[in-house]
Structure formats: structure tokens, C-alpha cells
């Protein structure tokens, strides 16, 4: 009965979405407030029914109801409760239900908290959201129904893919989907603006918080996925330029450009057409990512679907929304009035440069992702585009972007003083050069690329600090006055500085890990000692342990340095009998921002085992950077100016009239 309830709740959600996609538009056409208000009630009701459908699937997994095909294929009665729950979205059908649940959540949030929006705009936005929802409800019900029953129910399930039975899966996909789907709000605002033929600074003020929310979650989702791959796959890699990883990076790049473009539009009423186009392209790239994962066109640890019917259906959705939105843009963009002018050397000019570099970088990743797929489809020629391509194309573009980052916030709007900003950034530049010299001397005159990259990271961080120092007057004003100005500084200014500094932190981590990573790969027996980056790693023994739904072989390593024992590390290999597969569970020793990493291979008949030991200097900075960026986004989001909607004109103060 639970399965049937979940199914019919999804059908009712589809019916509500169809009503929401039509009636409010009729109301907007007729200027009927009652019909336009239908969008709000149907969006909230739709959220209720989709939420009920998702809860029903969770209950089926928790109860191990193997009469439902989705539960049978992806669960097991002995699986821990946490992984029963996360197994709901560890498969194609369940993950698509999570996708539409988050889509309904964002629509419900606009309905609930969009009271400051003009009624007509809110009706259009929610109608566009309903178009998207209707398409994906149909996709789930026709090709990917998670509530299908099995005629002769088995007594036990096949279990979830062992690689996905990890705490990271509880966090990574939901965060990623909150980012992917969150950009649908920016898309809907853009289409609504084109339909109404009106876009102004108020529109940018309304759309920026929703874009920022999606960007925060996508940033954290990508970082969490990278860290999950790092510790779960067993060989210490954190980014593989996998097509599905690229599919999450592309909307992040476009979304970052959109945030900065919307800022120009809000402050200077400029870049209107470009901001609308970015809103469309960002969500289009999210849809492309959905197609790559769900269509079966690629083979990846991230990919689920192999049914060609699903791929064709999603391709049709992709063509419908991307093609339709770009056609509407082409027809209506010329009617949008252009905003204010600005000099090339200005904050607007810096943000345009930011958008140019981010867009070109996104195009490079798009080419590297789709070109091999196109070659395989058109010429039956299999090829891959890996790190060497991106190191030669993407990395220089991002280096230029990082070099420009400290200048943007310090330039004035409309017309800036580049020489003056350069002088104010002199201390940050000197700090970067000093670090370059120190690192180059420490590496004894090796390649200059790594020291230069680290110096660039320091320059970005110091530039963010300099911006805050200049805004507060910490150097030129009395301390009490500077602190008072710091308290009055908008949270968005603090957030922007933290986000920019996070980029520098991540760059330093990436450079240190890739340049000075130490590796030891060998077969070890009991009492053997490996020497890695000053650490002595001794294998004390192997033992077996029975887990809830797996058998585990654990190796015990004693780790010491200069004769002092630091830790006992216990990496393992788990064999899952139900699936007949195994996973590697790495052991990590964290010291500061660096880590010692041990993973196991196969054991032989003599009792020896293959071992990988890595020392990864400052590797945690790779993920601390995105966390700092996301925190900066949250701080900006908490700024009251991003929560109250469009600014209202100040009322003129009434003068006191003398008594007659």
C-alpha cells in the first residue's frame, strides 16, 4: 500500500504541475489576480505530494519491502539503517525522485517567501517551474518509476553498490542536486522576464539570492564529491576530469559568472541581455549534466542509467527546454533596453573580464567533455580527454582570472583608477613574491611554476584582506573608528572577501598536493617498514572482521616519526557477499593540513599484501578553500539587502510647517 500511495502522490503532483503551468499564465494574460494566485497554492500542494512520494520510497527502503523492484535492486535486510536511507538516491529511479522533490522544494520556497515579488512575475516564474516539473514527472512515471512491484517477491535484496555505501553518499548527491536544481529558479526568472518584456535592477535583486543559494550548495556538493572520491576509491585522487565531474563543474563556472553579472545589473542596470543569457545557460548546463548521468552515454562511477529509452526521453527534455528558451531569448532580447555605460577600467569592466574568463573556461570544459562523445557517435572512434588537455587550456585561463580577482572589488563603479588600486595592492603583491622566493629556494631551484602558483594563491588571499583593510580604514584611521566601520561593513563585503580568499586557499592546496605528493607502492609482510616523507610505517599484522553485510580484512600499521609513535592506522578491504564485489577503505592520518594516506590491494598466499602509501602535503586546503567560499556565500546571503527584495525609493522627509 505504501508503494501505491507514493505512486499516486506522484501522479497527483503531475496533475498539480499541469494546472500550475497553465492557469497562472492565463491569469497573467487576463490580469486576473485570482488566477495568478493559483500558482502559489498549487506550488505548495505540489511540494506536499512530492514530499509524500519521496517519504514513501524512504519507508519502503527502511522496511526492506523487496516486493518493490527498486528496493530489491538496491537494498538488503542486513544493510545498516543509514545506508538503507541513502540507498534511496543511490540508484537512477530514486535519485530522479530526489531531483524532482528538490525542484518542488524550490518552487514551494518561491511561493512561500516570494511575497515581495510582483504577482504577475511570481505567476510566470512558478509556471515555468511547473513546465520543468511536468516534464520530469512524466519522465519518472513513464521510464523510471521507483514504485513498480515484482510479481513474485524475493525474500532478500541484491544490496546497494558497495562503493556507494559510505557516509559521503548521504551528503554529496543531495547537495549537488540542491545546486543543480536551484539554478532552475534563475532560469525561471529569466524566462519570466522575457515573457513580460521587463528586466531591471529590481529583477537582479530578486534573482541573486536564489542564484547564491544554488551556488553555495553546488560548491559544497562538488567539494564533498571530490573528498569522497579521494578517500573511498583507494588511490588518493581527488579530481579525474571525469565527464560527470565536468558536468557539475560547468554549471558552477556559469553560475559564478551569473552571480557577478547580476551584481553589475543590480548596481548599474547594465549587462541585461548577458545576465538573462547566463541564467538560461547555467540551468541548461545542469540539464546537460542530468542527461550525461541518466542517459547511459558514458561509463562512470557516477552514471546510473543504461536504458536507451531514458536517454532519448531526457534528450527530448533537453532539446525542448534549451531550444525553447534560447529561441525565446533570440526573439525577445533585442527589445530589452540597455543599461548604463561604464569605462573599461572600472568595477563593471573587471566583472566583465571575470565573466569572459569564466565563460571561456566553461566552454573549454564543455568541449573536452562532449568532443570524445561526438567522435564516438559520429566516427565510431573511442578517445578520452584527460588532465594534459585541461592543464594546457583550463589552467592558464583560471590563473588569469585569479590574477584579476583582487583588483575587481577595489575598483570604483563606472570609472576606476587602475594605478591607484595597483598601489594599494602593492603589499599583497610583495607578499606573493616573497612566498615565491621562499618556496623556490626551499625546492632548491626546481621548476618555477609551482612557486609562482603558490605566490598567486597568496596574492589572492592578501588581496582579499587588503580590500577589507581599505574598506575599514584599519591602517589610516584610529583603531576604534576602524572597528566601528568594520561593524558597519555589509555582510556581502565580508562574504565576497572570504569567497575570494577561499579560491587562493584551494589553489595552494592543489599545487602542493600535485607537486610534492610522495608515493610508496609495494607488497609488505608483517614487520616490514616503509619510509615515506620522513614517516616510518610498519605493518604489524592482518586480521579479519565481520561487518553487518560484509567481511573485512584489516591491516594494522604503526606510524612513527623520529622514533616517536604517532598513530596506529587501520586501512581495510571489504568483501560484500551479496554483490560479490569489494571496496577499499583507506586510512588517513591528519597532521595540520597534510595527510598520510594508506590503502590496501590484494593479499597473496604468503600473507603479504599490496600497499599504497601517500604523503599529501597541505591536501586539506583543497577542500577548506571551497568550504570558505561557501561560508562567504552564506555570509553574503545573510545580508539584509539580499533578503528584502528590491529597494524601495526613500520617502522625502516632511518639513515642519510653521504654525499660522
UniProtKB/Swiss-Prot annotation:
Keywords, in A-Z order: Cell inner membrane, Cell membrane, Cytochrome c-type biogenesis, Membrane, Transmembrane, Transmembrane helix
Biological processes, Gene Ontology terms: cytochrome complex assembly
Membrane topology value: Multi-pass membrane protein
Annotated TM spans: 8-28, 42-62, 94-114, 123-143, 175-195, 210-230, 233-253, 273-293, 311-331, 350-370, 392-412, 419-439, 445-465, 492-512, 617-637
Major location (coarse): membrane
Cellular component annotations (GO), alphabetically ordered: plasma membrane
Matching InterPro entries: CcmF_C (IPR032523), Cyt_c_assembly (IPR002541), Cyt_c_biogenesis (IPR003567), Cyt_c_biogenesis_CcmF (IPR003568)
GO MF term (any one): heme binding
Top-level taxon of origin: Bacteria
Location of the protein in the cell: Cell inner membrane
UniProt key word Ubl conjugation: no
Known role: Required for the biogenesis of c-type cytochromes. Possible subunit of a heme lyase.
Family: Belongs to the CcmF/CycK/Ccl1/NrfE/CcsA family.
Record protein name field: Cytochrome c-type biogenesis protein CycK
Gene: cycK
Amino acid at each position: 500500500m505504501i508503494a501505491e500511495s507514493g505512486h499516486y502522490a506522484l501522479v497527483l503532483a503531475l496533475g498539480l504541475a499541469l494546472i500550475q503551468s497553465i492557469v497562472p499564465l492565463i491569469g497573467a494574460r487576463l490580469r486576473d489576480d485570482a488566477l495568478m494566485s493559483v500558482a502559489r497554492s498549487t506550488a505548495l500542494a505540489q511540494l506536499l505530494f512530492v514530499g509524500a512520494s519521496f517519504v514513501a520510497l524512504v519507508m519502503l527502503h527502511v522496511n526492506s519491502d523487496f516486493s518493490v523492484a527498486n528496493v530489491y535492486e538496491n537494498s538488503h535486510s542486513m544493510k545498516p539503517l543509514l545506508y538503507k536511507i541513502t540507498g534511496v538516491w543511490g540508484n537512477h529511479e530514486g535519485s530522479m525522485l530526489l531531483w524532482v522533490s528538490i525542484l518542488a522544494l524550490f518552487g514551494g520556497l518561491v511561493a512561500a517567501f516570494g511575497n515581495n515579488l510582483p504577482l504577475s512575475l511570481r505567476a510566470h516564474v512558478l509556471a515555468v517551474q511547473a513546465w520543468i516539473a511536468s516534464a520530469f514527472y512524466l519522465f519518472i512515471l513513464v521510464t523510471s518509476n521507483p514504485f513498480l512491484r515484482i510479481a513474485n517477491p524475493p525474500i532478500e535484496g541484491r544490496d546497494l553498490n558497495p562503493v556507494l555505501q559510505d557516509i559521503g553518499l548521504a551528503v554529496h548527491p543531495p547537495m549537488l542536486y540542491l545546486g543543480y536544481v536551484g539554478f532552475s529558479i534563475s532560469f525561471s526568472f529569466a524566462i519570466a522576464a522575457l515573457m513580460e518584456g521587463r528586466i531591471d535592477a529590481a529583477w537582479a535583486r530578486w534573482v541573486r539570492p536564489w542564484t547564491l543559494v544554488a551556488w553555495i550548495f553546488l560548491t559544497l556538493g562538488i567539494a564533498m564529491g571530490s573528498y569522497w572520491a579521494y578517500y573511498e576509491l583507494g588511490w588518493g585522487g581527488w579530481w579525474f576530469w571525469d565527464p560527470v565531474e565536468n558536468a557539475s563543474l560547468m554549471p558552477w563556472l556559469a553560475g559564478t559568472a551569473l552571480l557577478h553579472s547580476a551584481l553589475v545589473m543590480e548596481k548599474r542596470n547594465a549587462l541585461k541581455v548577458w545576465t538573462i543569457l547566463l541564467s538560461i545557460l547555467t540551468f541548461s548546463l545542469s540539464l546537460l549534466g542530468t542527461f550525461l548521468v541518466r542517459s547511459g552515454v558514458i561509463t562512470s562511477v557516477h552514471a546510473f542509467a543504461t536504458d536507451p529509452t531514458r536517454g532519448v526521453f531526457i534528450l527530448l527534455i533537453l532539446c525542448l527546454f534549451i531550444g525553447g528558451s534560447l529561441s525565446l531569448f533570440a526573439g525577445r532580447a533585442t527589445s530589452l533596453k540597455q543599461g548604463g555605460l561604464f569605462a573599461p577600467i572600472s568595477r563593471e569592466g573587471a566583472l566583465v573580464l571575470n565573466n569572459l574568463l569564466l565563460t571561456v573556461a566553461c566552454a573549454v570544459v564543455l568541449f573536452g567533455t562532449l568532443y570524445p562523445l561526438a567522435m564516438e557517435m559520429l566516427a565510431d572512434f573511442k578517445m578520452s580527454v584527460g588532465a594534459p588537455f585541461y592543464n594546457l587550456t583550463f589552467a592558464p585561463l583560471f590563473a588569469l582570472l585569479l590574477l584579476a580577482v583582487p583588483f575587481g572589488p577595489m575598483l570604483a563603479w563606472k570609472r576606476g583608477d587602475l594605478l591607484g588600486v595597483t598601489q594599494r595592492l602593492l603589499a599583497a603583491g610583495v607578499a606573493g613574491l616573497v612566498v615565491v622566493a621562499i618556496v623556490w629556494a626551499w625546492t632548491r631551484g626546481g621548476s618555477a611554476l609551482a612557486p609562482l602558483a603558490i605566490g598567486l594563491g597568496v596574492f589572492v588571499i592578501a588581496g582579499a584582506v587588503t580590500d577589507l583593510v581599505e574598506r575599514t580604514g584599519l591602517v589610516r584611521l584610529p583603531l576604534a573608528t576602524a572597528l566601528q566601520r568594520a561593524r558597519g561593513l555589509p555582510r556581502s563585503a565580508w562574504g565576497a572577501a572570504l569567497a575570494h580568499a577561499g579560491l587562493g586557499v584551494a589553489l595552494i592546496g592543489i599545487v602542493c598536493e600535485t607537486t610534492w605528493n610522495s608515493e610508496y607502492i609495494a607488497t609488505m609482510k608483517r614487520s616490514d617498514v616503509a619510509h615515506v616523507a620522513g614517516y616510518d610505517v610498519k605493518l604489524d599484522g592482518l586480521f579479519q572482521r565481520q561487518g553487518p553485510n560484509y567481511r573485512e580484512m584489516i591491516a594494522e600499521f604503526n606510524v612513527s616519526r623520529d622514533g616517536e609513535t604517532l598513530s596506529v592506522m587501520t586501512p581495510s578491504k571489504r568483501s560484500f557477499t551479496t554483490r560479490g564485489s569489494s571496496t577499499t577503505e583507506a586510512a588517513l592520518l591528519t597532521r595540520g593540513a597534510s595527510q598520510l594516506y594508506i590503502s590496501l590491494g590484494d593479499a597473496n598466499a604468503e600473507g603479504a599484501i599490496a600497499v599504497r602509501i601517500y604523503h599529501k602535503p597541505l591536501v586539506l586546503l583543497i577542500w577548506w578553500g571551497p568550504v570558505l567560499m561557501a561560508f562567504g556565500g552564506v555570509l553574503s546571503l545573510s545580508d539584509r539587502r539580499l533578503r528584502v527584495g528590491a529597494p524601495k525609493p526613500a520617502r522625502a522627509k516632511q518639513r515642519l510647517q510653521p504654525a499660522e
